[in-house]
């Protein structure tokens, strides 16, 4: 531990001061402290000093300087979460200034896609809802085994995934809600399909009902209007009451016959008999 030239602190002490001022939120004082550091390359390449410079640049709205710092040095993984927040928040602020309104979830997603995290502060693993895929895999595997972990199990999961107990609890709660909603939707679709099937089954007989009705109408339709022979027969029957019973019986027989030709012959026989009798009576 050697003292820095013309400066009363060692490199480790400088790093400690930067961390203490950051945690205390004394960012203006931190900025003045960084400005007072001597021009020493190995001091200004110290990770704690670089992180402090990034925090001060964000605090002052100097986002270009912030991006330059974050992209020019390979930071340790334990510093990634803090520096990733600075990167994203800075891009959110710039996007909100351009659009003139706060960003929603979709707007922030588009910003993240447009300005992906640099590999200097990101290990390259995809994240989803701020959870790494490895952490989500652990949670999904446990959920399949037990959707309701105990408080002790939640603490163990938090340690295994690097998340907080609250984050683990919220993940399980949200996952259960999504599954319940999916089950309710599936039941609704099943009920709708069953209802549709029942309606189709009820309507199916009507498809053939038309032909049944048609045949019924034809079967029970009134007989055709009497032809000219039938009219003459009726007139002859009315003129000669003695032949009425014979004519009516012949008419009934003609109605019961299905063949058109037989129907006509029977009408002629029934007609000629009474007419002949009538002519004989008139001649006498």
Curated annotation (Swiss-Prot):
CDD domains in the record: homeodomain (cd00086)
Biased composition range(s): Basic and acidic residues: 179-190
UniProt entry keywords in alphabetical sequence: Activator, Apoptosis, Cytoplasm, Developmental protein, DNA-binding, Homeobox, Nucleus, Repressor, Transcription, Transcription regulation
Family matches, as InterPro entries: HD, Homeobox_CS, Homeodomain-like_sf, KN_HD, SIX1_SD
Region (Disordered): 168-230
Coiled coil residues, start to end: none
UniProt-annotated location(s): Nucleus; Cytoplasm
One Pfam short name: Homeobox_KN
Molecular-function annotations in GO: DNA-binding transcription factor activity, RNA polymerase II-specific; RNA polymerase II cis-regulatory region sequence-specific DNA binding
Family matches, as SMART domains: HOX
The organism's place on the tree of life at top rank: Eukaryota
GO biological process, one term: otic vesicle formation
GO CC terms: cytoplasm; nucleus; transcription regulator complex
DNA-binding region per UniProt: 124-183
Biased composition annotated in UniProt, kind: Low complexity: 191-202
Family to which this protein belongs: Belongs to the SIX/Sine oculis homeobox family.
Biological function: Transcription factor that is involved in the regulation of cell proliferation, apoptosis and embryonic development. Depending on context, functions as a transcriptional repressor or activator. Required for the normal formation of pre-placodal ectoderm.
Name of the protein: Homeobox protein six1
Organism, scientific name: Xenopus laevis (African clawed frog)
Gene: six1
């Amino acid at each position: 531990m050697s003292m820095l030239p013309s400066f009363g602190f060692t490199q480790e002490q400088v790093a400690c001061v930067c961390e203490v001022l950051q945690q205390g939120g004394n960012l203006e004082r931190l900025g003045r402290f960084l400005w007072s550091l001597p021009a020493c390359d190995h001091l200004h390449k110290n990770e704690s000093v670089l992180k402090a410079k990034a925090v001060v640049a964000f605090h002052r709205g100097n986002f270009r300087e912030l991006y330059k710092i974050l992209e020019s040095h390979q930071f340790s993984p334990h510093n990634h979460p803090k520096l990733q927040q600075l990167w994203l928040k800075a891009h959110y602020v710039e996007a909100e200034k351009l659009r003139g309104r706060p960003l929603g979830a979709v707007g922030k997603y588009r910003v993240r896609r447009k300005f992906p995290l640099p590999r200097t502060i990101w290990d390259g693993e995809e994240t989803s809802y701020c959870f790494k895929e490895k952490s989500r895999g652990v949670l999904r595997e446990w959920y399949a085994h037990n959707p309701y972990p105990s408080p002790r199990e939640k603490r163990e999961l938090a340690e295994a995934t690097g998340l907080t107990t609250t984050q683990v609890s919220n993940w399980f709660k949200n996952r259960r809600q999504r599954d319940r909603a999916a089950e309710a939707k599936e039941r609704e679709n099943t009920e709708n399909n069953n209802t549709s099937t029942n309606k189709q089954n009820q309507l199916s007989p009507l498809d053939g009902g038309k032909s049944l009705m048609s045949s019924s109408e034809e079967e029970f339709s009134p007989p055709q209007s009497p032809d000219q022979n039938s009219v003459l027969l009726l007139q002859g029957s009315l003129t000669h009451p003695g032949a009425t019973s014979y004519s009516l019986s012949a008419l009934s027989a003609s109605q019961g016959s299905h063949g058109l030709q037989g129907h006509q012959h029977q009408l002629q026989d029934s007609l000629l008999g009474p007419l002949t009798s009538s002519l004989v009576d008139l001649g006498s």
